[in-house]
Regions:
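Positively charged, polyanion-binding regions of nucleic-acid-associated proteins
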Residues: 3-27, 32, 36-37, 42-55
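Phospho-regulated, low-complexity intrinsically disordered regions of nuclear gene-regulatory
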Residues: 60-141
């Protein structure tokens, strides 16, 4: 897939995510573009893979390009960046008491804070979020 096709897929993925839930996430764009298989994403979320880049079907240059195009789309559409803390799924309590230990997930091999932040930043359409909230049926208490 050439860069032009990839840009189209990235922007389309972001548009659809924003319409459905009001925000777009890099991992979902990677899944939508075919760079990250859903099963590999789940393996990473459950802690079976050390870092996300290891299971992506693209080199680091292409991954960087995807993240850059997401930022370009976000700036053009005035989306608000929002950091999201990714933690491991399925962590069980040892004896059923106390809090579950929180295990942070790593996106890149290097673990560089800038790279990690760029993967963990979701882009929010505040106006669309308000529309979606208004469209939800109100529950009475």
């Amino acid at each position: 897939m050439n860069k032009k096709e990839l840009i189209g897929k990235i922007h389309s993925s972001m548009y659809h995510q924003l319409q459905v839930r009001g925000y777009a996430a890099p991992v979902d764009v990677l899944i939508d573009t075919g760079i990250l298989p859903k099963q590999k994403y789940e393996d990473w979320r459950f802690g079976r893979v050390r870092y996300l880049e290891a299971v992506c079907n693209a080199n680091l240059k292409r991954l960087s390009f995807v993240l850059h195009q997401m930022r370009v789309y976000a700036q053009a559409h005035e989306l608000k960046p929002s950091f999201c803390y990714y933690k491991c799924w399925g962590v069980r309590k040892k004896n059923g008491t106390g809090h579950k230990p929180v295990i942070p997930l790593q996106f890149s091999k290097s673990g560089s804070p800038e790279i990690e932040r760029s993967y963990a930043t979701h882009f929010v359409d505040l106006a669309r979020v308000q529309e979606l909230k208004a469209a939800q049926p109100q529950t009475e208490e």
